[in-house]
Amino acid sequence: MKKYLFIPFVAVFLASCHESLEERAEREAKEFTKKNCPMKVSEYVTNDSMTYEKDSHTIHYYYSIKGKADTTALDKKQAKAELIKGIKDATGIRNYKENGFNFAYTYYSTKNKGQILLDVKITPKEYNTK
């Protein structure tokens, strides 16, 4: 009898510890930002933060650009193609890709505070093509 009372308790306990993929994405984004940001990616680019936008199922990366790269003359088509390739090649986000998450990248100017130089959203349709 005690055995049968224990089984539902364990099931409820384990279920309460289970974290959905969306909850995990939100938690990991907050942890990444807190532990790593701002993080210098290159001489001209800094990763400022990462968020998870539950309503659009999107992992969103925010960057600042400085120096000679801080210009509106970015080749947006080429930049998007490189970001798509990066997503395709990234193994650390495989679980998110397999579950159809979107990925967004926003690059801000450092010299013109608040100015968006590049704002790209990449969907599963784009990163799942060959």
What kind of region is each of these model predictions?
Residues F13-S16:
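C-terminal motif of bacterial Sec signal peptides marking the signal peptidase cleavage site
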Residues M1-Y4:
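Positively charged n-region of N-terminal signal peptides that target proteins for export
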Residues V41-K66:
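Short edge beta-strands and adjacent turn/loop segments
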Residues H18-R27:
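Signal peptide cleavage region of secreted peptide precursors
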Residues I116-K130:
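Short, low-complexity, Pro/Ser/Thr/Gly-rich segments in the mature regions of secreted, periplasmic
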Residues T71-Y96:
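Short, non-transmembrane amphipathic alpha-helical segments
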Residues I87-I116:
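A short amphipathic beta-strand at an alpha->beta junction
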